[in-house]
């Protein structure tokens, strides 16, 4: 149907700039899963771009598994769109209600530490962690890069950090966005990683190749550590730097001002589309550019070729068992507390160190 003014909410909320890049990474990740069937967990650092996660778990069918109203058809899609950033509906950021998520996406800086925590002593899990270039400037995130020093490939899983370097944060350029490729490579090499940069044209093929390289690197590191009698010290884990435009494939410019590839695409690119006819036309052209009629059938269900590489069952990242604590929880085994009791017959005569006793416990 043609776009009408009453199709548009009076107040539009959310963040666009990070969404296309994260959707791109999600799609590349599920393609890798379709090839090798690893257990992969998706962690969205810039979780304020929730549409990237919501749309993908909807497309893979996970959303509908947990919430009946989000079935993978026209009605479910309509419900998803209507209820995004809507009273009593879905929030504008990734939250605990999101299938497959273990991170609160509304506060930046904790994605990488969370990813490492998820894979410690969890040898079969790979956490794909998207780190925003603005997020990377926070203290917790900057420190978390060092967590690779504590990751034992013989006993733990792996983290695949993907720095989404789109060049801008909410109102200006980012530090990583201002760095040369050589500076970025040297930075991560100095941290003990093996970095690869994906940029330019034909990004789909480049990203597929680099994701495959990263996966094979992880497998080699883990195989060596788990089969060798000697301890494998300081492996160089892979890290990917994706340099793509902020607001990728969105509105290029409006009123003579650049939007795509600029901080203006961070949130809502055009907030007055109901009152500005020119902006309304830009919005309409933008929505039509996705050619939704080539992706879904008359019932709103994705065409078979669209789902060809989408994993099934628990291989879907939105259905990864490690994102649901109740599925993997184990009883916590405590020593018998009374064995560490300090016994005395008279006060003031017995000497004991509380730290030494606690250490024994």
Labelled PLM ranges:
Residues 1-39, 46-47, 135-139, 158-162, ...:
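Conserved acidic/glycine
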């Amino acid at each position: 149907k043609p776009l009408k003014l009453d199709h548009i909410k009076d107040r539009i909320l959310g963040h666009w700039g990070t969404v296309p890049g994260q959707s791109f990474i999600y799609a590349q990740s599920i393609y890798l899963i379709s090839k090798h069937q690893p257990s992969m967990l998706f962690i969205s650092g810039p979780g304020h771009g929730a549409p990237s996660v919501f749309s993908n778990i909807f497309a893979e069918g996970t959303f509908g598994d947990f919430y009946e109203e989000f079935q993978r058809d026209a009605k479910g899609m309509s419900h998803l769109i209507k209820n995004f950033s809507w009273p009593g509906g879905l929030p504008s950021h990734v939250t605990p209600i999101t299938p497959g998520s273990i991170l609160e996406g509304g506060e930046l800086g904790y994605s990488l530490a969370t990813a490492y925590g998820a894979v410690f002593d969890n040898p079969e899990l790979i956490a794909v962690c998207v780190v925003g270039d603005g997020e990377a400037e926070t203290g917790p995130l900057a420190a978390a890069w060092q967590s690779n020093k504590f990751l034992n490939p013989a006993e733990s899983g792996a983290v695949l950090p993907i720095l989404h370097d789109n060049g801008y944060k909410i109102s200006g350029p980012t530090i990583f966005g201002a760095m040369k490729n050589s500076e970025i490579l040297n930075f991560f090499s100095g941290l003990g990683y093996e970095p690869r940069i994906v940029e330019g044209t034909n990004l789909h093929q480049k990203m597929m190749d680099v994701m495959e390289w990263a996966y094979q690197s992880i497998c080699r590191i883990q195989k060596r550590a788990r089969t060798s009698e000697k301890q494998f010290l300081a492996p160089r884990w892979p890290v990917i730097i994706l340099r793509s435009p902020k607001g990728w494939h969105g509105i290029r410019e409006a009123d003579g001002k650049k939007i795509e590839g600029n901080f203006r695409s961070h949130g809502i690119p055009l907030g007055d589309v109901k009152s500005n006819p020119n902006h309304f036309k830009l919005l309409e052209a933008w929505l039509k550019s996705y050619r939704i009629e080539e992706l879904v059938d008359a019932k709103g269900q994705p065409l078979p070729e669209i789902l060809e590489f989408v994993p099934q069952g628990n291989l879907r990242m939105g259905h990864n068992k490690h994102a649901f604590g109740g599925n993997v929880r184990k009883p916590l085994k405590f020593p018998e507390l009374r064995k560490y009791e300090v016994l005395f017959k008279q006060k003031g005569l017995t000497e004991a160190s509380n730290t030494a006793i606690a250490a024994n416990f």
